[in-house]
Amino acid sequence: NGDVRISYAVSDTTSPYYRNAIGDECVYVESGSAVVETVFGALPVRQGDFVMLPRTTIHRWVPQDVDGSGPLRTYAIEANSHIAPPKRYLSRFGQLLEHSPYCERDLHGPTKPLLAEGSDVEVLTKHRGNGPSGIVGSTVVHTTHPFDVVGWDGCLYPYTFNVSDFEPITGRVHQPPPAHQVFEGNNFVICAFVPRKVDYHPLAIPVPYYHSNVDSDEVMFYVD
């Protein structure tokens, strides 16, 4: 739709250099492992990671077949906006509050600068244009390598969050879907229905009659 795009990719080869100039991306790693090389540095990723890539971040995926893990399998969510923790998890200063199902220590940023060298480096760039969907692509050639960076400053950077670090919110009776929310974008949310103790009151209804999502579409992605 006009707010979010979803895709699924399987690969065992290094991707081209890429930049999404339209919105943030959240990529879930179903299986496999990789290093996401970015202008901010190297970002190791593994099974169960949500990989958060801010808009316009130049990057490429380098799959790593560790211990026969096989090809990299990913589920990608592309926004037309930023993707961030829900506002109710945050203080007015941007800190994750105690009732949030995860904390800052669960978020992992790039490990070190890449200091890559090269010239005439092609970067595939997705941006707005006059195509049927309003989205087009261009190839931008950088005269010097975009990863030839010794450091950076600020608080906007790619990071990973592993779903195993998500602490589920439970209750004696059925909890509504927002209890399972991990991130949000403009007009959509990302939830994780992780293993948990559910509806443990003796008279609880596991799937109550009033649980009907009539105002939004749902896409369920099942993983082991």
Each language-model region and where it sits:
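Jelly-roll (double-stranded beta-helix
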Residues: 1-224
